[in-house]
């Protein structure tokens, strides 16, 4: 059993740092790097790419709304042509830095409110995925379970790696529950580990409403800004390996190169 372990990193700004990127990088196989809109800046992006290369970790773009104040978790009503340009801009920024270091961006994921809207609304997912395919038809779409995103990716020939968010609750449609609802974010470490164990052994999760939902992800996501993220990731990795799993990035699972 091969499973990717990924985390959202590079989410500081200027002199301010969020999370322990160095420690996380030693535990994961793929990094989703903020591209300067919800968080990050050119220097942090460059530093995080270098950390990923040193750790043998895949470089991925984590794109969001232009909302540093709200950390990209507030919905913004943006005209679709403007939004696709913003996404392309973020992809290009990270791709340029990665290329300067001899690496390519292997995957991308949507952050926060942008990801939630795209996952729930084909009218957003379709033009966004079309723009991504125009930028790089081999860019892997790392996404939580979403018919809208997965369907649009298939329509434009983009590879997909479904990611399970270990510390987030899901609804009965397989979408993430709003952070504003009680129980949407799971803080109990034992519960997080139990969810991952069930997923890997039974191929199912229990939804926020208490129903059983099948899920077959290629990746498990840990939020780097979560308190205790490093310790949790250490235990998650140990749990995966104890079940016979191998930590392998999505690019290797799908046979894609990490060099330009």
Curated annotation (Swiss-Prot):
Catalytic activity: 5-oxo-L-proline + ATP + 2 H2O = L-glutamate + ADP + phosphate + H(+)
Domain of life per record: Bacteria
GO BP: any one term: carbohydrate metabolic process
EC number assigned by the record: 3.5.2.9
EC supergroup of this enzyme: hydrolase
An annotated Gene Ontology molecular function: ATP binding
The keyword Phosphoprotein is assigned to this record: no
SUPFAM superfamilies given in the database record: Glycoside hydrolase/deacetylase
Keyword terms: ATP-binding, Hydrolase, Nucleotide-binding, Plasmid
Pfam families: LamB_YcsF
Matching InterPro entries: Glyco_hydro/deAcase_b/a-brl, LamB/YcsF/PxpA-like
Function, in words: Catalyzes the cleavage of 5-oxoproline to form L-glutamate coupled to the hydrolysis of ATP to ADP and inorganic phosphate.
Oligomeric form and interacting partners: Forms a complex composed of PxpA, PxpB and PxpC.
Family: Belongs to the LamB/PxpA family.
Protein name stated in the entry: 5-oxoprolinase subunit A 2
Natural source organism: Ralstonia nicotianae (strain ATCC BAA-1114 / GMI1000) (Ralstonia solanacearum)
